[in-house]
Amino acid sequence: VRSRGLGDVYKRQMGIYDRLHQILPGHPAKLFLLIGVNDISHDLAPDSIVDMIRMTVERIRKESPDTKLYLQSLLPFNESFGRYKKLTGKTDMVPEINSRLEAFAKEEGIAYINLFPLFTEKGTNVLRSELTGDGLHLNEDGYKIWVKAIKKKI
């Protein structure tokens, strides 16, 4: 298991695309993709974000066709922490993107893991404050929920 969490390396999800050459020659049995939320803070439209994820999936399938893909929904974030100003007012973009990702996964026969509802405050699109320390990244309790959800799918 290797994590390629890149944070703001390229400030765009295409940074992952550009680094696939580090992963794909090993023809991994499985890849879990949880990408796109950083792009929201860079003012990319939902269509652009989904298109970049689609390009990433196409490249993985071309260069490592036997790799089983798991496309995870974007996680919610919580603006009340005030740390990520560029996400302000954009909470409702996440379910919109997730809806498009789920449709894409269904069209392409890719396993889709809908994590979003596991992490939101009831009746909102906001990340539960007890699952984060900064409003964006999961804390230990958040990771426990994530791991449990992933294990159910594999």
Give the predicted meaning of each segment.
Residues 46-56, 94-97:
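Charged helix-capping and loop-helix junction motifs
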Residues 1-10:
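Single conserved hydrophobic/aromatic residue that forms the stacking wall/gate
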Residues 76-154:
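Catalytic His-Asp segment of secreted/periplasmic serine-dependent ester chemistry enzymes
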Residues 64-68:
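A short helix->loop->beta-strand "cap" motif at the edges of active sites that frequently abuts
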Residues 8, 38-46, 87-88, 132-136:
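Second-shell loop/turn segments in exported
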Residues 14-50, 74-79:
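Oxyanion-hole/transition-state-stabilizing segment in secreted/luminal serine hydrolases
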Residues 32-34, 58, 70:
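Conserved, well-ordered alpha-helix/loop/beta-strand core segments that scaffold catalytic motifs
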Residues 7-8, 34-37, 72-75, 115-117:
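Active-site-proximal beta-strand/loop segments in catalytic clefts of secreted hydrolases
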